[in-house]
Amino acid sequence: MRGPREARRGSLLNEPGLIADGSVLIRDGRVEEVGPTRRVENLKAARGAVEIGASGRVVMPGFVDCHTHLAFPPPGLARTDAASALNAVKTSTARSLATQMGNCLQAMARHGTTTVEAKAACWGGQSAGLKLLRALSLVNHDPVDVVATLLFCLPARGSGPDGAEAAVEWACEELLPVLARRRLAQFADIEWSPEASRLGPIRRYLETAARLGLGCRVHADGDGPAQAAALGRELRVAGIDHLENLAAGELGGVAASGPVVTLLPGPAFHRGSRPAPARALLDAGAAVALGSNFNRSQGPILNMQTVVSLACREMGLTAAEALVASTINGAYALGRASTAGSIEHGKPADLIVCNVSDYRELGCHSGMNLVHLTMKRGEFIYQEGAVAPLAAERLRLAW
């Protein structure tokens, strides 16, 4: 997947950089060389290397899931019940929350994800988000890399402009400085709201986060996504996410914007609603990434293979576009393109071996795990296990 040093757009999304009969030479957890097998195996550095066969399988970069809500309250509570969710977080220990998150990360690793963005929501004036971020810090690199994001949610509509201004005032003066100082998050995200009275607070939040050295994202899952993209382009945010409500006449402005557009086919499939206009965005020149939006209430899918399949079936992406969008473009959305998303010389050896003979088969299956091996920094963190037959005496049925 070598290519330009920027997120892929247009025809480049259909060029995954395939190598037929290829090999990867790994040394000290990093890619030493990648290319045709005949050339790689004749390198002096390859002498004495341990060979791991992958004949008949596809070797590809580990998935980069660039949009999840991994840092959610304990099971059984949705964000719609904000008071109960906040209380549950407050009464839980960071360690117990970390255990819950760690279990999800292990499941992600089994399904081929090696880098994941994880949002911790903060509902204005509450510090529960800090505890969720502390819990995330306990599970980073175990077993995958976690890019922590604070998602700031403005007060409910109808609370008036003063409510939004007061919430952002608190976030800018107290919350964001703590995040930056303690390095609890790499990104600051904010839920988009198109009301004129809220544009000022949203702008202030993003500008303050950028000034403190945090990356910025915009959560545009409601009305007015084109306005969100315009502000994101102006402020040079890293990504604009969701965009399910984007109108046809707004495609050009969004596609021309600098930020990577992260699309989420899972929630639309789960709810039976209309997904974002992915095909139109791609044709208009947008740099598109794919994320799972994993959370228990609205998107209980953490398998990026399923996300790829849904993107092909429900959004009209080609298999190549979905592959690029779920790896290197996801890495660009997270500012991790130098360390994730492709198999290139010098990059960490984050890769997966899949039980398919052609990468295009990834878009033909849904709800399956096609991953045979998952490697993180040159170490296997997951290996597919054999299904052992049961002894005959254990197969006797009792009637």
Segments and roles (model prediction):
Residues 215-216, 222-342, 354-359, 366, ...:
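Active-site-adjacent C-terminal substructures of enzyme catalytic domains
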Residues 4-15, 326-328, 345-399:
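C-terminal cap of metal-dependent C-N hydrolases
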Residues 31, 112-113, 185, 237:
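A structural motif
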Residues 1-43, 361:
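N-terminal metal-binding scaffold of metallo-dependent hydrolase/deaminase domains
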Residues 85-102, 106, 114-227:
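Metal-coordinating catalytic core of metallo-dependent amide/deamination hydrolases
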Residues 67-71, 191, 219, 242:
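Histidine-centered divalent metal-coordination motifs
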